[in-house]
Regions:
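Walker A/P-loop NTP-binding motif
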Residues: 232-245
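A contiguous, basic/glycine-rich beta-loop/short-helix subdomain that forms a polymer-engagement track
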Residues: 341-356, 372-378, 510-623, 632-636
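Signature of the SF2 helicase/ATPase Hel1-core->accessory helical subdomain module
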Residues: 343, 348-355, 359, 365-491, ...
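Metal-dependent nuclease catalytic cores that hydrolyze phosphodiester bonds in DNA/RNA
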Residues: 1-78, 82, 108
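Mg2+/Mn2+-dependent nuclease catalytic core
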Residues: 57-154
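Conserved pre-motif I regulatory segment
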Residues: 176-221
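A substrate-engagement module of RecA-like helicase motors
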Residues: 178, 185, 246-361, 369, ...
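Conserved small/polar residues in nucleotide/adenosyl-binding loops
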Residues: 643-647
Length: 647
């Protein structure tokens, strides 16, 4: 009997979710992730409340064994002695619109947990409680229903029978894919020098997976010279390992679109060389780049009343998947756009939903490493994932940027000006935050005055801030460094973070109430900037430092991640193995340290190209500085032509 691993949330949402994509209730995150609110409510529930209870069970339906797994938000026994399964949901839906039957998925999730727990504990009945936390008002609304064990069992069996045809589709495809990959041949007549060695290293890493010594998965750093065909040298052995049962899905992660294209081209070559190859792939692209119905400013408008592709998305997506999964497919950006138009669904969300049914997922680093946009459907728990990280020399800087945040005081001033005259909750919050940053700017200047030798030391915007008898109202902690209007602190001042957090709720309300306003895009940008700072503050620890910089009337606040190693390590630990490769990964000790892979194997392949073929020429009269590049293009082109032309 075939076995299918199925997360409980995925089961209920796939079958029961209906309606439209609506960013008003799902796209913003004022509460700094639902998990933060969950922890708050769980802590307040008392000692008898079991939080985040892991539940799993094997159930049979339609000749398929389903391995169901999930975490109940809470389980406790009430004052009557009845066991209660608590399902916590954060929502931006107005309190008056929160009803008992608002979302059938919520009841279904609690009922499945209840079915598992009742069977395991031999309970004849129990209660399921929905706890809604309204993030604007901090209001808690609860609904309770009682179910017998038989009712819960029948409900779960019904869900599994409904899902069985989809599970059977997955089972049949997995068998076909495994057989196909087992017969996969290298698509060229012979390996280039260095290709076989690289392929062998990656194949062995994928096979090894998680071991007693590598509980976070086997890690490999591979430095290979440009020109040997690294993309195929990575993809081919990883796919062969999958064909042997060593890996369920392959994620090819890149820093640039050009390397995504290289991965797509390599897969196309494999299909061309072996037309019967059963392998599906999807390329994930940022929502802003694939949106088919942007607003006047060019931003996605993910509201059912504004976007026909968002309206009714969940009512149409299963029909789209049914049609698209009938054959082998490579769903690149163009293919997703065509399919989205055909079925009238959002291309971005379609790509995400297709990724669950594809064998290879190609995308930017952020789909694994970014704490905001990573693929929660895969990486909130570990799985048999194979990670190929291309151009890995770019990852340290990208990772630091993903976990850091930057905010400028001027964005508050400009937002107040954009709102015009009149009083509002938003303007009040903006004014308080602006004042807090103004005081921080004064404190910054006092702690780290400009050197008088500098040309801009007499900037009136700086010197006029602090009359002799005036001190800033905000006192900064002892700095790590203070010079030239720049201050580094071990911790971010709470006097700055609190008023910035307070801007989020009224700003959210304004954005939802004024979607067509001329300044909507400007205030949306402010919202995301505040959100980034709040999120960075939430994960702030000893790996961060705070930088305050005063320039003229500006104050820049940065929460800088200096060492992304623990965050990268945690991301990679979601998978079975990870191969990070590039032409430049030296010294390996640095990359292993900064990427949290201190015990990883590191190999450097010799260049297959004769050393005498290297030509090194110095042209000091051509500037390649960024600001000079456009003016230097012709000179660089002429020089390349001159030195590569036959003499």
């Amino acid at each position: 009997m075939a076995t299918v691993h199925l997360p409980i949330r995925q089961l209920v949402e796939f079958l029961l979710r209906t309606g439209s994509i609506d960013s008003r209730f799902t796209g913003f995150d004022r509460a700094l992730e639902g998990a933060h609110i969950h922890r708050k409510l769980q802590k307040a529930a008392g000692d008898g409340y079991q939080a985040e209870v892991f539940l799993s069970v094997e159930r049979q339906a339609e000749d398929i064994t389903f391995t169901l797994e999930g975490r109940a938000d809470g389980i406790f026994t009430d004052e009557t002695g009845t066991v209660v399964i608590d399902e916590i949901k954060t929502t931006a839906v107005p309190p008056e619109e929160i009803t008992e039957d608002m979302n059938p998925c919520h009841w279904a999730q609690g009922m499945v947990y209840g079915a598992i727990y009742a069977a395991q504990q031999s309970l004849p009945e129990l209660n399921v409680r929905l706890t809604y936390y309204q993030i604007d008002t901090d209001q808690i609304i609860r609904f309770i229903r009682r179910f017998t064990q038989q009712e819960l069992d029948e409900f779960l069996d019904k869900l599994l029978c409904q899902y069985a045809p989809w599970a059977q589709r997955r089972i049949e495809w997995d068998v076909k894919r495994t057989q196909s990959l087992a017969a996969l041949q290298f698509p060229f007549a012979q390996y280039r020098p260095g290709q076989r060695a690289m392929a062998g290293e990656i194949y062995r890493a994928c096979r090894a997976g998680k071991t007693a010594d590598c509980k976070g998965g086997t890690r490999l750093f591979c430095q290979a010279p440009t020109g040997i065909g690294k993309t195929m040298s990575a993809l081919f052995p990883a796919l062969k390992a999958m064909g042997e049962g060593n890996g369920e899905k392959l994620f090819y992660l890149t820093a640039r679109n050009t390397t995504q294209t290289a991965a797509e081209d390599a897969l196309t070559r494999l299909h061309t060389a072996q037309p019967e190859l059963a392998l599906r792939s999807v390329t994930l692209t940022a929502k802003e780049k694939v949106c088919l119905h942007p607003d006047a400013e060019g931003h996605p408008a993910c509201l059912p009343e504004l976007c026909p592709y968002a309206n009714g998305y969940y009512d149409r997506i299963k029909d789209a998947l049914t049609a698209l999964l009938d054959g082998t497919g490579s769903f690149d950006r163009a293919a997703l756009a065509g399919a989205a138009k055909r079925f009238s669904v959002c291309p971005f969300e379609l790509g995400l939903d297709l990724s669950e049914w594809c064998d290879v997922v190609i995308g930017d680093y952020n789909y694994l490493f970014d704490p905001v946009v990573h693929l929660k459907r895969f990486f909130d728990s570990s799985g048999e994932w194979l990670f190929l990280v291309d151009e890995a020399h770019n990852l340290p800087d990208r990772a630091r940027a993903m976990y850091s945040a930057r905010f400028c005081k001027s964005s508050l001033t400009e937002a107040k000006r954009a709102l015009g005259k009149g009083k509002s909750a938003l303007k009040t919050a903006l004014t308080k935050a602006d004042k807090a940053l103004l005081e921080a700017r004064k404190a910054c200047i006092q702690l780290a005055p400009r050197h008088s030798s500098q040309t801009d030391a007499a900037d009136p915007a700086q010197t006029s801030l602090l009359p002799e008898n005036t001190a800033p109202a905000l006192e900064l902690p002892e700095p790590l460094y203070a010079q030239d209007s720049t201050v580094f602190l071990q911790e971010p001042p709470s006097a700055l973070l609190s008023p910035l957090r307070a801007v989020q709720a009224p700003l959210q309300d304004w954005l939802e109430a004024n979607p067509d306003a001329e300044v909507h895009a400007q205030l949306l940008e402010l919202y995301f900037a505040v959100q980034d700072i709040a999120r960075a503050a939430e994960r702030y620890d000893s790996h961060f430092v705070t930088q305050l910089t005063a320039r003229g009337r500006e104050l820049e606040l940065q929460l800088l991640c200096l060492d992304p190693a623990p965050f990268v390590d945690a991301s990679l630990a979601a998978g079975r193995s990870a191969a990070l490769f590039s032409a430049t990964l030296a010294p390996p000790s640095f990359y292993r340290s900064v990427l949290g892979c201190s015990d990883a194997r590191a190999v450097a392949l010799d260049s297959p190209f004769p050393a005498e073929n290297l030509g090194l020429y110095c042209l000091p009269n051509i500037s390649t500085r960024y600001r000079d590049r456009e003016a230097s293009v012709q000179a660089v082109s002429d020089a390349c032509l001159l030195y590569t032309s036959p003499s």
